[in-house]
Amino acid sequence: MTSEFVDLQAWIAPETQKPEEAQGPAFDARGANWRNHDVGQRDLSGALLCRCDLRGTNLSECNLDGADLRLAIYDSATRLPDDFSIETSGAVGPGAKLNGAFLNNADLRGIDLRGAILMGAYLSGADLSGAILDGTSLAGADLRHAKLRGAMCRQTRFGTSQLDMADFRGADLENAALENVESIKGTDFSLCQGLEQQLDTLLNRDAMELDHWNPFTRSTARKSLESLRG
């Protein structure tokens, strides 16, 4: 019977790996920051790239067959091989298909999620402050205690999502679909833009939702919505 031991002297923390060090299959760079790197022509087949920051990264000449990109972050400037679909890889970025994804307490500040599909996603406690969520589908998502301060939520489809205790302060909610959300208990809409046409509908919700105190923002949904009246 044999056992395998990790050589701690030769071990390199995955998050410190640089793209120029990539060699061989199953290269481990989990959590590494490769932002704005030109990776060049490299074999990244089977590579572990989950949680990597790939915003602005050029991977267009790489072999990404079987690479694990779950929760890696990309943006519109990320370049990829023509035959690779990052939208269905589990990575986070514009157009990503993340239905039912577990993103509880994730740090998604400033992330570009335009047009992403996050139906039924678990986003409770996630920090989406400053994120771009224009045209994103969040129907059935769990956004309880999520932070969306200053987020761009234009034409975002919230559907039947749960917004209890969510912090939307300063968010742009122009043409966002909020009429069918499950609950706004303790939700703070202070300083939001684009809610003028929905104020009456939101203020007609159950008093249990509207008057629930949010100890973090020190407000209620009712108070925050009424503050938006001209």
Segments the model singles out, each with a brief description of its role:
Residues 1-230:
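Tandem repeat scaffolds
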